[in-house]
């Protein structure tokens, strides 16, 4: 009974924990630890004996939760915060539901539905995470270089999980990729834009990087053109607002 409803109970618990903390402003560490344990327990119940095969995915899920929580904390409007929390929990329920179907038919040769969705799940939550990191640098004066390292590690972890074992990518590819995203994070940080825009710019290039690598360099011109236009538009609009 509990196993079959775990994908519903976990999002409800996350939402309850967020609402209680936002209302009382107490017990931050306790609620974070309980929520992380809830995610791990749900992952175990959902994946069964395949839990350790997907340990990198579960690590990314924990990072995703921390990024979401930090993002919600930096929202000043209470209505936006609670509404965002509800939407995020609906997404968690959908992810667990898809994972339940994925592991139920684990030996099926093709499980493209969840694997395709996971890319967008990671992209969205990377935006939460990166935007939160930029805000922490600005408002809490956290060390820039440590956060660069943290973002690069998260990008590497998500990309590694998305590529899986099907693509044999050498150390040179990963070294150049890590160096590229470290540069992008640093360059975007020094632009006169909000942390929302900064996070969007980095995530756009992460999406292009993932799409290009997973699609075996097919149909490259379309995505790169759209991302370049979006990058230019975001920069111009942000500078216009500032000036």
Where in this protein do the model-derived segments appear?
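Alpha-helical transmembrane segments
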Residues: 3-19, 34-39, 57-69, 122-127, ...
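Final/C-terminal transmembrane alpha-helix of multipass membrane proteins
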Residues: 223-243
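Cytoplasmic-side transmembrane-helix entry/capping segments in multi-pass membrane proteins
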Residues: 52-64, 84-87, 109-122, 168-177, ...
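Hydrophobic alpha-helical membrane segments
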Residues: 38, 61-66, 178-181, 197-212
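Intrinsically disordered, low-complexity segments enriched in Gly and acidic/Ser/Thr residues
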Residues: 161-204
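C-terminal ends of transmembrane helices
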Residues: 40-54, 96-111, 155-167, 208-219
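Hydrophobic alpha-helical segments and helix pairs
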Residues: 64-129
